[in-house]
From Swiss-Prot:
NCBIfam families per UniProt: gltX_bact, PRK05710.1-4
One of the protein's GO biological processes: glutamyl-tRNA aminoacylation
Catalysis: reaction(s): tRNA(Glu) + L-glutamate + ATP = L-glutamyl-tRNA(Glu) + AMP + diphosphate
Protein family according to the UniProt entry: Belongs to the class-I aminoacyl-tRNA synthetase family. Glutamate--tRNA ligase type 1 subfamily.
Positions in coiled-coil regions: none
Enzyme Commission number(s) of this protein: 6.1.1.17
Protein name: Glutamate--tRNA ligase
Length: 481
């Protein structure tokens, strides 16, 4: 048997972190078993589905590296298949037209609520006579198509995450609506139904999705049986929770993959983190995984039942590990869009070689890619603002003389090298009879505006290459005086 799994997002919003995590688990399971990962777009909600959301979903999956083997298939292009399946259930007497109005349903719910009962449809139109149906249609009533669910039926399956699961038919809310009214007569098929038709048609062997679909699974098993199809294996993964233990939602801030991307998370870091959101590797000390490495180890026996808390600190740490170990040329490519978005210009000598030197300088201090914007601002600005500490340092006794001596020494150094920079510092220490610390602090304050920052010599070399070191030294002397 070839393992066949699917991810089936609805294009009613951008790709959500929960959907993406489900996609990761499906992808890992498929690759672990040498199977197929199928992409299906569930766009039957015509009012809320948008092409820009579809584009966002596809782009997000590609960015994460979750390449699919088949698809994308669009449910909106498969309506004839669903309507044919609805008609078969009608012809077999397994489904029927229900003419109960919304007002009648509301009255039923209120009566059940008053009696302390759980709301459910009472199946009142299951056995209408032809005359009763004709009378309702003469009234102009619209209808839905309901699938018959027997109250006494017990639905049992072995969930690969949760073990034996059991539901009674009486707990499923009465006969299930599988289609709304339509002019063709067979109805507009709804989610719980079309999912089963698609999974049968696409020969899905394993359905991997969030635990919020457990009740749907009980209903869908009955539909598989009614359509004479083999029932797939089910795995219901834990929900993603916030740190307070509630389901992660938009109220918690960022939830879409494109937002994580804009915040400066790498695809590799985010995928690594999502892999660990609910799954524990055999080696509990291993935390860094590529998709390919995780696929070799992945299995549902190590997927947790309890909800997985979204830990921003852990995500930041993982992301920083990928940034710190990304080759300079690739990391430069990743950072350029963030610099461009900040309005930084690659002119005045800021060529590719210079950019890669800058990346080498700041890379180990980055947690997110976007951190490169503030950390490199001083290299893209003609001038810098002096912090309170920087200004204080420049006014310290001896600082002005030190800076003037550095300016004089630079007159004989049209292009500064690391060795030459070190020699200038030694020369100034000797000539001015001061400690090296004063020279270094004064030079840093002059060049960067602060007393803290990245490696001073490398910063100086970068500024020298674009002709900004001398002008900043002169301005700092003015500031000191």
């Amino acid at each position: 048997m070839t393992v066949r799994v699917r991810i089936a997002p609805s294009p009613t919003g951008n790709l959500h972190i929960g959907t993406a995590r489900t996609a990761v688990f499906n992808w890992l399971f498929a690759r672990h078993h040498g199977g197929k990962f199928i992409l299906r777009i569930e766009d039957t909600d015509l009012e809320r589905s948008r092409p820009e959301y579809t584009d966002n979903i596809l782009e997000g999956l590609r960015w994460l590296g979750l390449n699919w083997d088949e698809g994308p298939f669009f449910q909106s292009q498969r309506l004839d298949l669903y309507k044919e399946a609805v008609q078969k259930l009608l012809d077999q007497g397994l489904a029927y037209r229900c003419y109960t109005t919304s007002e009648e349903l509301e009255a039923l719910r209120e009566a059940q609520k008053a009696r302390g009962e759980a709301p459910r449809y009472d199946n009142r139109h299951r056995n209408l006579t032809p005359e009763q149906r004709a009378a309702y249609e003469a009234e102009g009533r619209s209808y839905v198509i309901r699938f018959k669910i027997e109250d006494g039926r017990e639905i049992v399956w072995n969930d690969l995450v949760r073990g034996k699961m059991s539901w009674r038919g009486s707990d499923l809310g009465g006969d299930m609506v599988i289609a709304r009214a339509s002019e063709e007569g067979s109805g507009q098929p709804l989610y719980n139904f079309v999912v089963v038709v698609d999974d049968i048609d696409m020969q899905i062997t394993h359905v991997i999705r969030g635990e919020d679909h457990i009740a749907n699974t009980a209903k869908q098993i009955l539909l598989y049986e009614a359509m004479g199809a083999k029932i797939p294996e089910f795995s219901h993964t834990p929900l993603i929770l916030n740190m307070e233990g509630r389901k992660l939602s938009k109220r918690d801030g960022v939830t879409s993959i494109s937002e994580f991307q804009k915040m400066g998370f790498t695809a590799e870091g985010l995928v690594n983190y999502m892999t660990l959101l609910g799954w524990s590797p055999p080696d509990s000390t291993q935390e860094i995984f590529t998709l390919e490495t995780a696929a070799k180890e992945f299995g549902f026996e190590r997927v947790n039942k309890a909800g997985a808390k979204f830990d921003w600190d852990k995500l930041d740490w993982l992301n920083s590990q990928y940034i710190h170990n990304t080759p300079v040329d690739k990391l430069t490519d990743l950072l350029i869009p963030f610099w461009e978005a900040a309005g930084y210009k690659f002119d005045g000598g800021r060529d590719r070689a210079w950019l890669e030197q800058l990346v080498t300088l700041i890379s180990q201090s980055l947690t997110r890619l976007v951190d490169a914007v503030p950390q490199s601002q001083l290299f893209f600005s003609d001038t810098v603002e002096f912090s309170e500490e920087g200004s204080t340092q420049l006014k310290q006794e001896g600082s002005t003389a030190v800076l003037e001596a550095i300016v004089t020494a630079l007159e004989n150094q049209p292009q500064l090298s690391e060795a030459a920079a070190q020699d200038i510092i030694k020369q100034v220490v000797k000539e001015q009879k001061v400690k090296k610390g004063l020279v270094m602090r004064s030079l840093r304050a002059a060049l960067t505006g602060d007393v803290h920052g990245p490696d001073l010599i490398q910063s100086w070399l970068l500024l020298n290459q674009i002709g900004l070191d001398k002008s900043r030294l002169s301005r700092a002397i003015t500031e000191a005086n």
